[in-house]
């Protein structure tokens, strides 16, 4: 799942030759289908939204629950690309987050599930496939999501291999008996099963929670994006072909996303975007007082995040907002990335926001007439892809 965020760029480069290798496509709700058919992803009013899901049906694989039947969305990431193509925001939803799930019918079994007012978000895929997961996140955020994709664990392994591995920093040793992952402190190049184990590791990082795993995944994602945008990966046709084949042969796409014009358009929206404008955030949550294994939506902070996404505002994170299992790399200042737009604050360097009673804070205009970044509440953790961070083992 980690490498899917760059697949829009890489896969689109040879989409015409590779789309046939995708296992199959799925339909979303009627409204989402119509939007995907009629809209141009490069010029969608309010920006483009894509839901990316990671799942595997193999019971007992690594850190999964051994009594689980069927697929669950272990990873749920909403990608918002601004209409002006100046920022990408990837919002990770904890799998242990309790949310309302609408009534859904499983497309494979025909089983109907009634609407639930409080259910774990990772149950939505099993209730009604990709479409149900999309409807769940739409209801939660108030956004329209016309595009979606699901990748299996095998896809993560093959795509990391195609890239020749991803370099990650480990601040404290990781020793996870559940995934078998053992990493000493320092730099590591991860691919194949090691890359998958790193992305799946929960017990080996931070405080052992799913929230810690999300911040560790953001370390990997950011390192991956820096790699593919800095070493010529996207201009290497051999690597692109391998990456595209690995992605599409292990992905299920919504009908609207499984179109050559859509993937090529997606590539054009990301082309030239600075990694400082690629922002990873965790959907804001609070502990469930009745069950410490679960979390609930932080209503105030979530409202602010939802509003800025709905209004397609450029955003920034407060200082020192890395997650539960990440910290700034000691070598972070050795290869600084310049920002070509002085009016835009770096995604990870905004001031903390106290919020307002009426919704998200307003963004002031920059010196060149471009709106400056709206700072997100300090309770929202994450980082930009340009920030060099390390995963903290426990």
Where do the protein language model's features map onto the residues?
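Non-catalytic, solvent-exposed segments at the cell envelope interface
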Residues: 1-394
């Amino acid at each position: 799942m980690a490498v899917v965020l760059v697949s829009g760029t890489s896969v689109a480069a040879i989409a015409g030759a590779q789309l046939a290798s995708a296992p199959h496509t799925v339909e979303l709700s009627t409204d989402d289908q119509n939007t995907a058919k009629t809209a141009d992803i490069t010029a969608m009013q309010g920006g483009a939204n894509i839901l990316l899901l990671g799942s595997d049906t193999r019971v007992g694989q690594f850190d999964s629950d051994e009594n689980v039947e069927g697929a669950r969305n272990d990873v749920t990431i909403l990608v918002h690309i601004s209409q002006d193509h100046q920022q990408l925001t990837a919002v990770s939803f904890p799998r242990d987050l309790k949310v309302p799930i609408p009534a859904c019918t499983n497309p494979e079994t025909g089983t109907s599930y009634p609407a639930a007012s409080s259910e774990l978000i990772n149950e939505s895929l099993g209730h009604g496939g990709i479409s149900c997961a999309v409807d769940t996140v739409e209801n939660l955020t108030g956004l329209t999501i016309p595009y979606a994709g699901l990748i299996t664990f095998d896809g993560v392994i093959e795509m990391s291999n195609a890239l020749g591995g991803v370099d990650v920093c480990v601040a404290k040793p990781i020793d996870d008996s559940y995934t078998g992952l053992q990493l000493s402190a320092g730099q590591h190049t991860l691919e194949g099963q090691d890359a998958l184990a790193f992305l799946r590791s929960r017990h080996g990082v931070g405080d052992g929670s799913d929230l810690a795993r999300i911040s560790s995944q953001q370390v990997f994602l950011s390192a991956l994006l820096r790699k593919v945008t800095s070493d010529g990966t996207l201009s290497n046709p051999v690597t692109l072909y391998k990456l595209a084949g690995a992605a599409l042969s292990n992905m299920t796409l919504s009908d609207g996303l499984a179109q050559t014009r859509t993937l090529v358009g997606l590539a054009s929206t990301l082309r030239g975007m600075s990694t400082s404008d690629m922002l990873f955030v965790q959907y804001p949550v609070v502990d469930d007082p009745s069950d410490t294994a679960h979390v609930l939506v932080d209503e105030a902070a979530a409202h602010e995040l939802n509003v800025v996404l709905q209004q397609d505002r450029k955003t920034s994170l407060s200082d020192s907002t890395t997650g539960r299992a990440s910290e700034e790399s000691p070598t972070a200042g050795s290869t600084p990335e310049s920002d070509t737009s002085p009016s835009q604050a770096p995604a990870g360097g905004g001031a903390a926001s106290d919020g307002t009673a009426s919704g998200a804070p307003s963004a002031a205009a920059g010196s060149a007439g471009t709106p400056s970044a709206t700072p997100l509440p300090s309770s929202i953790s994450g980082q930009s892809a340009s920030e060099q961070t390390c995963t903290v083992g426990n």
